[in-house]
Amino acid sequence: ASYSSQKNPDYIQIAKGKSAKNFSDEDLKNIFNVAEKARLTLTNRVQLKTPDADLNNFGANLAVAADGIWESPTFLHGAIAWRMRLNAWRGAYTADALSWHDRAKEHFESYANSQVLKPDFAPVEMDTMRHLARHEEKMGTSVFASGYISRNPNDTTKPHHYDMNLVFFDQLFSHFKYTGDKEFLKKMWPTMVRHMDWEKRNFKRGDLYDAYAAIWASDALQYSGGKVTHTSAYNYRANREMAKLAKIIGENPQPYEQEADAILKAMKNELWIKNKGYFAEYKDALGNQIVHDKPGIWSIYHVSDAFILNEFEDYQNLQYINNHTPKIPITVKGADNKNYFTLATTNWQPYDWSINNVALAENLQTALAYWQAGRTEDAYQLWKGNLIESMYYGISPGNFEQLSHYDAFRGELYRDFADPIGVASRTLTEGLFGVYPNLLENKISIRPGFPKDWNSAELKLPDWDYQFKRTSKKTEYLFKSKYQNPVALEMQIPVNYSNIKSVKVNGKKVEWKIKPNSILQPIIQFETPKGKDFKIEINYLGEELINEQTDYVNYISESLQLNFDSKKKIKNIYDPQGLIKNSPPPEGWIRPKGEDGVVNHKFELNPQERKGTFFLQVEQNGTTWWQPVNVDIHFPLETKWANKKLQIQSKSSNPINGKLNINGLNKTFTIQKNQSTSIEIPINYLSKGTNSIELEYNGIKQNIEITDWEIENQGEFNNISLASKYNEKVTEIFNQKYLSPRLKVTTLQLPWQGIGNWCYPLITAQIDDIGLMNKRKNGKVDFLEIPFLIDKTDKNVAFVSQWDNYPDSIEIPLTGKGKKIYFLMAGSTNPMQSQIVNGKITVQYVDGSTSELELKNPTNWWPIEQDLFDDNFAFEIPDDKIPYRVKLKTGELYKGGTLSKYSSIKGFTDRQIDGGAATILDLPIDPNKELKSIKLTAVSNDVIIGMMSATVLK
């Protein structure tokens, strides 16, 4: 079709049903013109100009979306889907960020009128109708008492199962900074005090806080009374802000200061993983009090948003995302590849709603966290990629989606969802332009977050205009404040030159300094006099700084060689994670030896496979800053088992002479640098399944495993009778009540049947073992040519658990020797126990030594009721570790994840196995040692670990 412009447009009316009246062309023209004027007023509210053409409609687009989620008196949960009232999540941040302070105030006031005032205190009543998974949803109980904000404005009568208070009051604290409205602060103070008391009463655990559905991604998150990073961060910020606000209006700040200090200290002591440099997801309250060390991205960015950490810690904490969070490439046929990617929120399994998703708001707030940590390039790359994916590549042009097309289970969802609109607003003003108003003190902090290759940018809002221009030797910032009172600007500006000639504000030179802990590049700090119009000029001398490499791969036994620009002197080292050999304790700086304190560019690192970061203080022309060094430490030999041969690839820069040992076989090998070799291993030294091999070279011992289930076993089998240890029939795993130990506190936790979550507390899975049991002959059943003995019928599994229903460990006596033990296992796990050890099988020898198999979700410990998922992105399991499974109902053997048909449990899983499945695992053992026993141990909470059979390969 072709079109040509018409000088006189035709106006068309589209109406549902019969029109109430006939409109003339003039009427329609007037209606259209009024609407068009309103549209232009709205789109011109946020005027953005950048060198990136993809972004220049972002401001107008954002204004329209933000207007779409407003319906007086409050912001809504979504513009189209979920167009309903809820006092959170992050949608309302858009109001103050985009200068709609009247809307913000109306939103806060109407929900303040929804705060419950009585009773002051009420008992904890966990909901027995929902199998103790959550608190009773009833007014007048512990959660729904004084301080709780109800879901509808101007209405205190409706309980709702989320702690939306936390984010609601976080938005309110920001509102006071954005407006400086002390009268409104005084009015809201009692409301805020009630909230703080409510949080402590319900969720305080020691000096930290539990999380009771307190963030968008909270469906199926349940911490069982544990100590949680993201809510502790929210409460830290709340107490810090309450202390500051108390001083302004003459209230007592001391209780809030003390609480904030206690939270900070406890977070550092209990949740900060010092040798890894990031915060854990949570710490269990019960059992082994495990620190769960694979956090969701919300644990990382909420810490940044509360400004808890110093610059070094903040950099390290964000590095967790770089090192460990699944990244999914954003690619579109025909589009230039700009290495855009999006993040999954976790790498946890099995999937359930909001446990492991690809969500726009989550990605945008992670980008904001990078900006808050001064990691501008990382911030921009993540931000831009996700905006492009949502606004250009998705189902609706200009959309702010909830979930992305790249979400493995749900795909793209919703148009203009409030949560990402609120976060997107903050990323524009606080992130890219770096503007943080604090009008309570008549100050504005500005920390520009522009990419290094931008030479201009401009943003106009009702509150302020901001223009950035850069030439070869000068950077200029024009800032026009439209606030009522004059303001001072607190500037922190990253610079690309080591020599600064002058800093001027409105033509007058001002004092400035380099921020002491500048990371990645020097950052200059200064404060302007109070005013409304500011012209800031930074004039440079000398050469532009060369960007240094930050990411290095290092091979064990080889020095790490840095290739910094020769003009930079390395003055100091800070090694908080203990990566460098003989590194002093990381409390203080390390003063290096050497002429003029200059450090060698070569470092010897501790010989351990890991990722980590240390920092080097560099100096050029008298200007100092800190350069991060991110290392990925590997063994220099990479191995692959293919065609019954072990292929070894050397990454070393030196020749390697080594020795291979497996089950008494010793073979020598030589590999030239960056070459590969193949070693044939006689079949009689191998066994079906997992084989442990030791490679010894250059003073290194590297233990590797090869897995091959097609190898023919050599040797006889010895079936172990577990009859005296069986304590349950496997079909009964979800047919009982797991009631203790549980804390008597308000929390979200596993329902008493041992499956499900707080959103779906009544679900179960029918386990049926008839096929497996009928397949036995003389008590034995063969899988993979391995005989498994199940020599009892009424009970056929030995369960262990941290629940009181079963012992936490069981010991099975053994005699003789063997080279491998095969196990038929069945039990439960859930996403809150993902990426950690759930249980252990320990083989004990007569001489006191042991061999151990860790049962880890998702690598080898899979839930009885469903299969886990492997897509190489958000759901990643090493292919050779995916176990064989046995369908209990039919006795059919299959490779995990490969069934052609799965059934579903509504709201819980679409990967259910009809009747459930057991898992075949194996553990190589020392063939030269006398066996004493097998010990089965439950390590993590919630789970049931079961052994149905054990077979020794002699």
Name the predicted role of every residue range.
Residues N630-H634, L686-K954:
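N-terminal/edge-of-domain interface segments
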Residues P522-I524, V599-H601, K667, Q675-I681:
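Short strand-edge motifs at loop-to-beta-strand transitions and within beta-strands
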Residues E137-K158, Y212-V228, L403-G411:
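Acidic/His metal-coordination segments adjacent to aromatic residues that form catalytic metal sites
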Residues A1-W82, L117, S174-K177, K182-F184, ...:
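Acidic/polar, glycine-enriched structural segments that form the non-catalytic walls/loops
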Residues M84-V116, P190-V193, D197, Q222, ...:
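Active-site core of glycosidic bond-cleaving carbohydrate-active enzymes
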Residues Q365-G578, E609-K611:
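Non-catalytic C-terminal accessory modules of carbohydrate-active enzymes
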Residues F479-Y483, I648-N654:
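Asparagine-centered strand-capping/turn motif at beta-strand->loop junctions
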